[in-house]
Design a protein with these regions (language model features):
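Second-shell loop/turn segments in exported
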Residues: 37-45, 78-87
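Acidic/His-rich catalytic or pseudo-catalytic neighborhoods
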Residues: 10-17, 21-32, 151-178
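Active-site-proximal structural scaffolding
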Residues: 47, 51, 82, 86, ...
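Conserved hydrophobic/aromatic pocket- or pore-lining residues that grip, position, or stack substrates
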Residues: 54-58, 89, 100
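Short, conserved phosphate-binding/catalytic loop or strand-edge motifs used
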Residues: 35, 69-80, 113-116
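Hydrophobic/aromatic-rich core segments of domains that either
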Residues: 90-172
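Secretory-pathway-linked proteins and extracytosolic
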Residues: 1-72
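Extended non-catalytic domains of envelope/secretory-pathway proteins
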Residues: 14, 24-32, 75-81, 88, ...
Length: 178
């Protein structure tokens, strides 16, 4: 009956234990990341401009389409992603968080899991993805579990999809006459 989880088998006692595997790989990113973040945002005036510049940089890196499970849940260090100019979706998310943190922007990596009755009934294989911000995930957060790397629930800011347009039509006694 669709994508309904019937049985969960995990080598981890909790979601928090599973996420420790990811969290342990996010080391102190050091001088390389800090210098790059400063260089990329040198002309920016606002926090939003800085975030946008860093996002453009990270999105401009090459993509490696391997999933977390295909990489054995291994993330390369941020400096290695910078040096190689490519990364998996998860590595690029970790790099974006590191770059933002390096210039004092509060950023955290978040994880998405299928929603389960037992909040701890999910291991690494159930991890849908890692991200800093994701409007697509924000749209469906009522149907999935979004947590920080300590497995604490996170509520994402919903984006409005309302499109508004106003046209003004001026009608006079000469309208339509030739």
């Amino acid at each position: 009956a669709g994508n309904i989880q019937a049985v969960v088998a995990s080598t981890y006692a909790s979601k928090a234990d599973a996420l420790k595997v990811i969290k342990q790989q996010l080391e102190n990113n050091g001088k390389d990341v800090s210098e790059l973040a400063q260089k990329l945002t040198a002309g920016a005036q606002t926090t939003e401009q800085k975030k946008d510049l860093l996002t453009v940089y990270v999105e401009g890196l090459g993509n490696c389409s391997l999933t977390l499970s295909q990489t054995g849940y291994r993330l390369r260090p941020a400096f290695e992603v910078i040096r190689s100019a490519y990364g998996t979706e998860a590595e690029k998310a970790a790099l974006l968080a590191a770059l933002q943190q390096a210039i004092g922007i509060r950023a955290e990596l978040k994880a998405a899991f299928p929603k389960t009755e037992d909040k701890d009934a999910a291991g690494l294989a159930a991890l849908s993805g890692l991200f800093v911000t994701n409007n697509g995930v924000a749209d469906i957060q009522d149907f999935i579990s979004v947590v920080d790397l300590n497995a604490q629930p996170v509520a994402l800011k919903k984006v409005t999809h309302v499109i508004s347009r106003t046209d003004t039509l001026r009608v006079s006694d000469k309208t339509g006459k030739m």
